[in-house]
Amino acid sequence: MKAKYVPLILSLTMVISASAQLKKVDYKDNSQVLSGLSAIPKKVNSNKPGVLILPAWKGIDAHSEEVATELASMGYYAFVADIYGVDKRPKDTKEAGELSGFYKKNITEYHKRISLALAELVKQGANADNIIVIGYCFGGTGAIEAARANMKVKGVISLHGGLGKDAARETKEITAKVLVLHGADDPYVPEKEITAFQNEMRTAKADWQMNCYANAVHAFTEKSAGNDN
């Protein structure tokens, strides 16, 4: 699943910087305890920009931790969302598929978990009017869903995320800016899904961009991933 070359999103996947530390933050969805990670910048920008990070289907991992730490070193408040719950950590791809599949089918539940994580990011100090969402794979789908749900975010970035939406769902106007970074050879996103997504963005009157990277496949930002080509 690894790209044959790494795209220009390197700034979000750099080595961990010593200038920021991660802090565990517990929060709740009714009785379900969620446990995210917060990274607060040492040098605070007056605009207090915030970035919500939605991890891939296995939940919070080393990659999302690295991204949060690097963003904080760049001056952003960063928060890694826990979508599944503190007691739900997938041990393998089968469990990850089952858990992520539940939220894809029950999209309002996914929206709720994203919204709760956004609230925690603001509690950590981020400016509620200056937040973006970035997501990887399953989290990339979540980033697009944050835009579809018109959550209070300035923009979203989806990296090798699923683009599909239930055709029965209404397409509403999207106010957040949308950036999709996609592997041109991703075997999990068919051309018809790409076409439907682009038509959806036009119907939604979104300010959107979609960059397709040649020879890049699924999970191209994951250093430990394989190669589908």
Feature map (PLM): residue ranges:
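Short alpha-helix in the alpha/beta-hydrolase fold that links the catalytic acid
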Residues: 67, 190-201, 209
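C-terminal catalytic histidine-bearing segment of alpha/beta-hydrolase fold enzymes
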Residues: 37, 202-229
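Short beta-strand/loop motif that positions the catalytic acidic residue
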Residues: 174, 180-182, 186
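Gly/Ala-rich beta-loop-alpha elbow adjacent to hydrolase catalytic centers
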Residues: 135-139, 143
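Serine-hydrolase catalytic machinery in alpha/beta-hydrolase-like enzymes
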Residues: 24-124, 221-229
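Alpha/beta-hydrolase fold nucleophile elbow
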Residues: 118-121, 125-136
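Acidic catalytic loop of the alpha/beta-hydrolase fold
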Residues: 185-189, 218
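A conserved short beta-strand
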Residues: 152-162
